[in-house]
């Protein structure tokens, strides 16, 4: 009975690119939902704890929930048929990722050292942490495909290593990740089976989907960094 079915809820937090993508997906499909910012709504945070969850985005209807990053699962919870989009070929995604990272490096180079610890609006994350996170995303992907390291939610938390302190440190790290991505694609990427399971924390997806998410995830945050430049008048 749709009249008594629990309302669809989306749990999110500001500055979360996956959260934005999840809400856009539901809106594009004409789905109404209750939007719950877990940083401001303690009830929402407790709802997630009751489900045994400590991450966002989450789409839930009662006790039935899905990680917002997996659209086929989101569609199931929301009650409509999921129509997968045509993904770009892996090589094209890698090219786009390189373009995104190059742009992010330019944005980072323009942020004054004294502004790096400025916080993003409504989110406990600094420009320094955001810059690191943009390049951390492909690093976690590479650690996963090259070294079989677990692709976990914790691995993507933007906690800077002790040896990354200055803007120059960040830019050096950025160059290392970019070089590593290029080498991986040139040596192993072209022969990788992207239809294999992605083996990631957020659901059952292919490695192709994980690669695609790597590109748009870094891309969304790069746009945030570009807006940060506007905010500080650059």
Language-model features: where?
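Local sequence-structure signature of Cys/Sec-based thiol-disulfide redox active-site neighborhoods
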Residues: 1-32
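Class I S-adenosyl-L-methionine
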Residues: 20-27, 49, 105, 182
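Thiol-based oxidoreductase modules, predominantly thioredoxin-like and allied folds used
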Residues: 31-44
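BRCT (BRCA1 C-terminal) domain core and associated BRCT-interaction motifs
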Residues: 42-50, 55
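A short, hydrophobic beta-strand/beta-hairpin element that forms part of a small beta-sheet core
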Residues: 55-67
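Short, helix-capping/interhelical loops that line the mouth of catalytic, cofactor-
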Residues: 70, 75-98, 137-180, 184, ...
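Charged/polar low-complexity intrinsically disordered segments, enriched in acidic residues
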Residues: 99-107, 130
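Short, contiguous alpha-helical
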Residues: 115-160, 196-234
């Amino acid at each position: 009975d749709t009249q008594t079915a629990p309302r669809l809820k989306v749990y999110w937090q500001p500055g979360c690119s996956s959260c934005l993508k999840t809400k856009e997906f539901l809106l594009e499909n004409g789905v109404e939902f209750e939007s719950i910012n877990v940083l401001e709504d303690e009830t929402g945070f407790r709802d997630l704890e009751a489900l045994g969850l400590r991450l966002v985005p989450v789409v839930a209807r009662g006790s039935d929930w899905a990680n917002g990053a997996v659209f086929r699962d989101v569609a199931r919870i929301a009650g409509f048929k999921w129509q997968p989009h045509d993904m770009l070929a892996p090589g094209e995604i890698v090219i786009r990722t390189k373009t995104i990272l190059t742009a992010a490096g330019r944005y980072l180079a323009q942020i004054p050292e004294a502004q790096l610890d400025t916080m993003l609006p409504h989110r406990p994350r600094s420009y320094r942490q955001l810059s690191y996170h943009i390049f951390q995303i492909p690093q976690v992907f590479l650690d996963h495909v090259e070294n079989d390291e677990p692709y976990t939610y914790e691995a993507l938390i933007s906690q800077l290593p002790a040896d990354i302190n200055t803007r120059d440190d960040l830019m050096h790290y950025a160059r290392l990740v970019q070089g590593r991505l290029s080498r991986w694609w040139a040596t192993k990427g072209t022969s990788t089976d992207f239809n294999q399971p992605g083996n990631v924390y957020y659901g059952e997806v292919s490695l192709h989907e994980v690669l695609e998410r790597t590109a748009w995830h870094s891309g969304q945050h790069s746009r945030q960094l570009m807006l940060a430049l506007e905010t500080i008048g650059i």
